[in-house]
Structure formats: structure tokens, C-alpha cells
């Protein structure tokens, strides 16, 4: 699309409007000029015209075909390349098959026929000729062909030539010297040699374009002073016999010159008489209507004695045949001076023509002799009076009707004057003696200024209406441009709104994505917190379970004695040590000596629990679960036995190797222990130690055990991967008990006499094992 696409579209719409009654050749020629000047590309122009050709309205299609015909004839090869191809021919054939309008069909056939004849010698346009032949074979009837319709004489601008130096001054082109092309000859020039600008009418370029100096001089040479050469004349005129004839006007003979001079004199005479009669008429008119007397066209003639000093012209009649008044009209100087004064003075309005024109003979026929008597003598006066009335009516505003009457009266007067002159010429009578001719001449001469004024008024009105038409066209173009600008503005606003909406959608999407990310993060944090809470709850539950398990295990590890301490006191002294209930109150069914577990968790737990309702081996364990084969006491071997047991396996803590860990064994009660004590426990005779405590009343007995504390209780807690302790070794006499090794420093160590120990029986452990009662320090 070229630079003038908007103008081209408007012109094309105007040239193909369905409201047209005839072809708009002005718009079509402007379209051709736009294409030839290069303002509109040929491809774009032809495609736009094709769209109009395919319009449903047959009038638009017909006018579009007219535009295409003119463009092909006037715009040269570029348009020919776009039209004379297979695609365009196929489109025209399809349109011919679809179209039902006769005029459009005939126009398509006419164009194909004309193009086939015009491009018959062009090999690259052979498709047009082939299409024409195919359509003839198919039976299409083409209209009558005229060879003049296929004359395509459209000159186009030459192609530009490329070179490295100026075509005129041979200057090499470089960075500072730019290339320029002449639009007239197509050669390449520098800036100095192509500094002129001119229009090129032969190429249809009506705007000033860059041309070289020789082409500028050739295009703008002066026409005056230069005769047109024979090469500029058309060849038809040069070959015709008219060119051989002389072009000078024929010479006039003496007789014709004399008749011309007589006619001029007669006209002058009639003008003088008409002026005199007009002056008299105005006097009478102003007497009836008192008004200011207007300035007459020319003052009355002065006396002949004071004006005429030159002799009478030889061409005038003889003195005895001419009256004295006629003699003064023969003075040429007088009439020349009279004409100068008439030009300087204002001329009155033309008179109103007669309502009933005078009778006149048929035009072009000879007038008989008696016609002269048929003309009334009052015709000049009547015509003059009518002219005055017309001037008054015209000044009062009756323009159209007055113009028509004036033109009709003038036509009648001129016709009568011509017929009278012809009649006098046929009869050989001099016009100077015909008063009717003189009066008619006077009336026509009087109406002549009014006719000129009327022509001027009509020209002014024509110019005025043409100006209005131009303004209307400008307004129409401005409205079209304004509508286009409004449409562009609306489109711009729509695009801006779409862009704003798109930006808003993008921002909303971004915000939504950010909120989604925040939500995901929040949900992830909540999930982590929930998992952490679940883990904490699970850990707490596991800890509670572990504590419960530890409690159960610790309870299971604690020995439960169902025999009261009173029964132990009744036991014989030879069977074992008597434990006196000299500690704090103990719970039934449990073993809790005073001072042994104070401050430990087990002490607090047992002290806070209520007394069980029934006595048994252990509150949380059923009595039936007690195994009678288990030993009924903790076994604490001597130091040598403890070292030997520690060396046998990795079990047990390494911090206190002097003792071996105990293994809790549920017992059946103190009855079994008391019954077996005289057999398993050796006789211990040791003086009482100060600082030792035990359930022996006033006698203190030292036992072979380590003090019971929380540090020594740690290895027995669950969760320690400690194997079971080695089996208890029997007590060996002669060794020092463990409690003497760990005795407090307040007293000297006590010597323990050897005690005879019997080996355990091979029977059940409840009957053959040696039991020792635990004493807490």
C-alpha cells in the first residue's frame, strides 16, 4: 500500500458509487494519476478494483470495470502485469458465469476482447489471448470490436540506472557525494547536476520531482518566440492535404472594405439617434415620476459647426443626397471621441424587452420589398422603454423573470436587425437610408451593456456556486477524514482498553499466584506444625508408655513379702537373723524397710499409694503367677565370687565391680524363707557396728551387699541392653562381706569370722538355694 492509499480509496469509492448516474471521469483520471506518479502501488490498486468488480451491486461492478479499463489504458506496464495474468482472467471468467446483469457481462466480454487485441504481440501476456480464444470456443458472443478501443498509449517513467559516477560531470559517488536519479530520463546524477524540480506531464507526474538540468530545460522551455516544428504535429495532419494549403487568411478586396466602412458609419448613426431618443424619453419619464435625474450614458451631441472641421469622407454619399444631420455622422473623429466618453461614463441598465415581439420574416429567407413598410416606426422607442422598465424590475429584485424577458426581447431585436440587413443587401439599398435598421441598431446597442452585465452576474453566480460546490466537496472530504480519525481514535481507545484489561489480568494473575504461593507456604507451615505436634504427642505417649513399662518392671523387680514382720521376730535365732519392725510403717504385701528408699521415686510412689485391700505377693501381679521354684531372696555373693561372675560375661556395670547385680525373683512369703533359713543361712556372730541399721532390734547385723541407691539401680532399668546376670555363686566362708569393704569411715573396719556354709542342694531352687535378707544402709 502506497502513501496515497487513503486518497485512492476515497477516489475509488467515489468513482464506483452506486448513486452515480454516469461515469465519474474526473475521479477515474485522478486514480490514474495516483498510480502513474507512484503514490499508489499498482498491485494494491488492482486488488482494490477487483474487490469492487466482485461487488453484489451490478452498478458498482460496472463502474469498477470502467475504472479498470481506464487504469489499464493509462498506467503502463506495471498495471498490465497485474491484470494480464492467469488469476485475473480466471476471476473474470468466474464473474461472467455468476453475473446475470447484461451490461456487466457485455463489459467483461468487451474488456477481454480489447485486451486480447492490444496484447497480441506480447508473449508474456499470451494468457489473455488464450482466454479470449477459449471463451469464443465456449460460445460466448463478443460485442462489436473497434480497433481504436484497444489503443493503449501510456508512457511511463523510465527505469532507474545504477552507476558509480555522475552521468553528466563524471564525479565519483562516495560518502559526501550522494546518488540522485532523474525522474524524466532515469539516469543517475550528483546533487549539483540534479538540483532542479519540475512536473512531468507526459508521465502523469503532476507534482514537482527531481530532474536533471537538461531535462528541466527541455520541460520548461518558453513557448513564445519558438515556432512549432513539424515533428510536434501529429502524423495524420502532416499526411493530409490540409497541411499543403496556406494557413493565412484570404485578402479582402476593395469592395468588401468599403462595405465594412459603411456598416460602421451606419452603426454610429443609429447609436447617435438612439441616444437622442433615450434622452427625450428619460425627460418625459422623470416628469411623470419626480426623481433625481440619473447621469445619462453620453451627453447630447454639440452643434455640428463647432465639432466638425474635417472634410466629409469620400466613401459617404454626395452632399446633395445627404441631409445636414447625416453629415455629422460621417465624421470619424467625433465618433471615436464619443466612444471614449461612453467608456469612461457609467452605462445605464438595459431596457425591458417588448412583451409582444414585432413580426419578423423567416430566418435565412430573402425579405421582399414591402417588408420595409410592415415594420412600425415606433419599434426603437418601444424597445428602449422596455429596456428601462426591465432595468427597474431587475433593480427591484425580479431577476429570473426579467432575465428571461430581456433575453427574449434581445433575441427578437437581433433577429429583426439581421433580417433587415439581409433585405437591404438583396435589394442593393444602402443601410444609411433605412431608418428601421438605424433604430434597431440603436436598441441593440442600448441592450448590449445590460447583456454584458447579465453575463458578468451569471459568471459571478457560477463562480459562487462552484465555490460552494468546492466547499461542499472539502466538507465531505473533511467529514470523511474526521470519520476516519474518529474510527482510528476509537480503535486506539479500544486497543488501550484491551491492553489495560490485559495488564490488569496479568497483575491479577500475578497477585493470585503470589497468594497461592503464600497459601501453600502457610499450609506447609501448618502441616509442619501439625506434624511436630503429632511427633511431640507421640513422643509424650512413648514416654508415658516407657514410664509405665519402667514402673511395671520396677514393681515386678521389687520383692513382695506377704508375711508380717511379727512372724519374722518369732523365728528361732539359730535359723537366721531376726528383723525387728523398727522402721516406718510399711504397706501390706510389700517390702519397704525404713531409711532405705527415702528420697527415691519409688519411695514417693509407694508412700502416695493407698494401702491395698488384700495382701498378696505384689499388688499389680496376681498371686498365681508366683513361681515356687524361684529363690525367695536376693543373693549377694562375696567379693571373689562377684569378680569371678563379672569376668564371665559383659553384663553388669563396670563402675562397681565389687557386687553382682541382683535378679528379682518372686517369693511365696516369709514362711518359706523362715522355714529354710535355719538350713541355708550360716550362723553369724558379729558384734554390732555403730552406724548400721537393720531390722534386728537391738542387734545390728552386717550383710554382704552394696548400698541400695539410684546409681546402683540404673543398670536394672528397662532399655539397658544388659544381658542377664550370671548365676549366683554360693557363699564361701572365710571371705569378708561386701558391706565391710564399703563401711563408712566413722569406725574401724570390723572383722567377720568365717561362717560355715553348706553347699546348696540339687533340688528345686526354692528349697536348696541360700537366701539372704536385704538390709538397706
UniProtKB/Swiss-Prot annotation:
Keywords tagged on the record: Acetylation, Cytoplasm, Endosome, Membrane, Metal-binding, Phosphoprotein, Protein transport, Transport, Ubl conjugation, Zinc, Zinc-finger
Q: What domain of life does the UniProt record list for this protein's source?
A: Eukaryota
What GO terms in the biological process aspect are recorded for it? endocytic recycling; protein transport; receptor internalization
Q: Does the keyword Hydrolase apply?
A: no
Ranges annotated as biased composition (Polar residues): 659-698, 730-739
Zn finger residue spans: FYVE-type: 160-220
Annotated compartments: Cytoplasm; Early endosome membrane; Endosome, Multivesicular body membrane
Q: Where is this region: Interaction with NF2?
A: 478-777
- Cystine bridges: none
Query: Could you say which residues bind Zn(2+) 2 here?
Result: 182, 185, 212, 215
Q: Which residues carry this modification: N6-succinyllysine?
A: 549
**Composition-biased stretches (Low complexity):** 292-311, 645-658, 753-777
* Role description: Involved in intracellular signal transduction mediated by cytokines and growth factors. When associated with STAM it suppresses DNA signaling upon stimulation by IL-2 and GM-CSF. Could be a direct effector of PI3-kinase in vesicular pathway via early endosomes and may regulate trafficking to early and late endosomes by recruiting clathrin. May concentrate ubiquitinated receptors within clathrin-coated regions. Involved in down-regulation of receptor tyrosine kinase via multivesicular body (MVBs) when complexed with STAM (ESCRT-0 complex).
Quaternary structure, per UniProt, is: Component of the ESCRT-0 complex composed of STAM or STAM2 and HGS. Part of a complex at least composed of HSG, STAM2 (or probably STAM) and EPS15. Interacts with STAM. Interacts with STAM2. Interacts with EPS15; the interaction is direct, calcium-dependent and inhibited by SNAP25. Identified in a complex with STAM and LITAF. Found in a complex with STAM and E3 ligase ITCH and DTX3L. Interacts with E3 ligase DTX3L; the interaction brings together STAM and HSG, promotes their recruitment to early endosomes and decreases STAM and HGS ubiquitination by ITCH.
This one is known as Hepatocyte growth factor-regulated tyrosine kinase substrate
